[in-house]
Amino acid sequence: MNRLMILVFAAVFLALASADEDVDIAKRGIPCLCVSDGPSTRGNKLSGTIWMKTGGYGGNGCPKGWHFCGKSRGLLSDCCKQ
């Protein structure tokens, strides 16, 4: 069971790390709460997408054409909006 969880986590991590090559990532990524979405997730649309921080991006972890929209920065990922 632990091996399966590690495998699934690694697959999601690799998919998100290489997602900048995907044209339609805004519809495929993991949604996150932007500051502009409101105070809670109940009934609010999650308009951000979680991006994994990689070496090719700037200090904010968001790819070119996207901007940071979350309340705080994550250790390995940021909530970004196109």
Swiss-Prot record:
Report the superkingdom from the record: Eukaryota
Any single Gene Ontology cellular-component annotation: extracellular region
A Gene Ontology molecular function term of the record? toxin activity
Write out the annotated subcellular location: Secreted; Nematocyst
Q: Which InterPro entries match?
A: Myo_ane_neurotoxin_sf
Q: Which UniProt keywords apply?
A: Cleavage on pair of basic residues, Disulfide bond, Ion channel impairing toxin, Nematocyst, Neurotoxin, Secreted, Signal, Toxin, Voltage-gated sodium channel impairing toxin
| Positions of the pro-segment in this chain | 20-26
Signal sequence interval, chain numbering? 1-19
Q: Identify its protein family.
A: Belongs to the sea anemone sodium channel inhibitory toxin family. Type I subfamily.
Q: What does this protein do?
A: Binds specifically to voltage-gated sodium channels (Nav), thereby delaying their inactivation during signal transduction. Causes death to crabs (minimum lethal dose of 25 ug/kg) and mice.
Q: What is this protein called?
A: Delta-actitoxin-Aeq2a
Q: Which organism is it from?
A: Actinia equina (Beadlet anemone)
